[in-house]
């Protein structure tokens, strides 16, 4: 009789982000993505939001000591192979998380969350400089959308030709790679991944589905999953783009506003 194969621990991925009570974005989206992509997801909660398909009705930041304690609890015992950051609403939180990332031997995917899908501010204006000077320099990959690029760099992207300029402005703050998400532009969904020397253009047809809540969180988490598996940044980003495109295609209505992408779309295939 053949002995049973012992269980193998999956790649370990940690999200440092806020909670979305509606389950579409934030740590809920992150953990669903991590499970769907075959990794073990862990979380450090930075804020609690009252949020649904119509927007954010309230947000409460957790104390820095609570964030630090959660992070140390996970990293010092279990360990991590990649970290993803999301909502960090204050300068103090940004600087604390940047310090923690700098002391962790794992790639970091930084999603510099500035506003929600509905336009609700999730980052204090006083924290912008800390994102620029403390958080972005410790990022393996930074994944801003066009609104966040403008918020952080002042560069406005009106068409695809502006994406290189946006990437250069983000890279000037120190991340190893910048993934500029051009999903808000007209035409195909075009993203640019670059480290300043090599470029990777990622294109997908624009999908006729308004239910896209959680897209940014999902993409950044999917990239982190790829990095935790040992993939290079370009390979991880390309796989993440494919996963998110499928999730948007399967996005479903929820409540009276914008529904979420379907994180489990590939599980039934």
From Swiss-Prot:
Listed CDD domains: HMPP_kinase (cd01169)
SUPFAM superfamilies per the UniProt record, alphabetical: Ribokinase-like
GO cellular component: cytosol
Biological process (GO), any one: thiamine biosynthetic process
EC identifiers of the protein: 2.7.1.49, 2.7.4.7
Annotated 4-amino-5-hydroxymethyl-2-methylpyrimidine binding sites: 51
Gene Ontology molecular function: ATP binding; hydroxymethylpyrimidine kinase activity; phosphomethylpyrimidine kinase activity
Catalytic activity annotation: 4-amino-5-hydroxymethyl-2-methylpyrimidine + ATP = 4-amino-2-methyl-5-(phosphooxymethyl)pyrimidine + ADP + H(+); 4-amino-2-methyl-5-(phosphooxymethyl)pyrimidine + ATP = 4-amino-2-methyl-5-(diphosphooxymethyl)pyrimidine + ADP
One Pfam match: Phos_pyr_kin
Keywords on record: ATP-binding, Kinase, Nucleotide-binding, Thiamine biosynthesis, Transferase
Metabolic or biological pathway: Cofactor biosynthesis; thiamine diphosphate biosynthesis; 4-amino-2-methyl-5-diphosphomethylpyrimidine from 5-amino-1-(5-phospho-D-ribosyl)imidazole: step 2/3; Cofactor biosynthesis; thiamine diphosphate biosynthesis; 4-amino-2-methyl-5-diphosphomethylpyrimidine from 5-amino-1-(5-phospho-D-ribosyl)imidazole: step 3/3
InterPro entries: HMP/HMP-P_kinase_dom, PM/HMP-P_kinase-1, Ribokinase-like
PANTHER family (alphabetical): HYDROXYMETHYLPYRIMIDINE_PHOSPHOMETHYLPYRIMIDINE KINASE THI20-RELATED, PHOSPHOMETHYLPYRIMIDINE KINASE
Entry's family note: Belongs to the ThiD family.
Task performed by this protein: Catalyzes the phosphorylation of hydroxymethylpyrimidine phosphate (HMP-P) to HMP-PP, and of HMP to HMP-P.
Record's protein name: Hydroxymethylpyrimidine/phosphomethylpyrimidine kinase
UniProt source species: Streptomyces coelicolor (strain ATCC BAA-471 / A3(2) / M145)
Protein encoded by which gene: thiD
